[in-house]
Every structure is written in C-alpha cells, then in structure tokens.
Amino acid sequence: MGKTGNIEHVEERVESELMPPSMYKVILNNDDYTPMDFVIEVLQIFFRKNEQEATDIMLTIHHQGKGICGIFPYGIAETKVIQVNQFARQNQHPLLCSLEKA
C-alpha cells in the first residue's frame, strides 16, 4: 500500500512538471524584389503547403507585409528560418524569414 502511494505521488509530480513547449510563428516578410513564384516555391518546399495554400499565404505577405507559414516548437521554427534564409540567399533573393513567439 505504501508503494502505491509513492508511485501515485511521483506520477502526479512528473505530470505537473511536464509543460508543452513554447510555440513560435515562422513568418515570411515582404520585399520588393523576391518573385511571387519563388515565395510559393518556398512555402511548398519548406512548409508542405499545396499550391492554393501557398498562393493564399503569398498574397497575404504581398498585401499585409508578412504572413505566417506555420507554428512550431522553437527548435523546428529556428531550423526552418535558417533553411529558408539560406535557400533565398543561394537563389539571390532578399526574402527574409523570421520567427516570433506565438
């Protein structure tokens, strides 16, 4: 009986210590030089958006100055930002990807 009480106490403590990870928005920012087709390609490659979703997000970026590509835990968001920015530079585009806390 004593052991059961200890196990329940440990389970409660572990559950109370587990917190969901902080989530971050990955954002693409508008610029006057990156072609719309390239933005759509980025959204399809790095965020697995279909053509319609990618087009909708691209138009949001174009009209509102930025658009959310997805919401991820920090490590994944940071990796996507780095990958997108490297891909844009490799293709000679100034497209800027950033993240902010959700």
UniProtKB/Swiss-Prot annotation:
Transmembrane segment boundaries: none
InterPro entries membership: ClpS (IPR022935), ClpS_core (IPR003769), Ribosomal_bL12_C/ClpS-like (IPR014719)
Stretch forming the signal peptide: none
Pfam families: ClpS
Highest taxon listed in the record's lineage: Bacteria
Gene3D superfamilies registered for this protein in UniProt: 3.30.1390.10
GO biological process, one term: proteolysis
Function according to Swiss-Prot or TrEMBL: Involved in the modulation of the specificity of the ClpAP-mediated ATP-dependent protein degradation.
Annotated family: Belongs to the ClpS family.
NCBIfam families: PRK00033.1-3, PRK00033.1-5
Subunit structure: Binds to the N-terminal domain of the chaperone ClpA.
Protein name: ATP-dependent Clp protease adapter protein ClpS
Originating organism: Shewanella sp. (strain ANA-3)
Gene designation: clpS
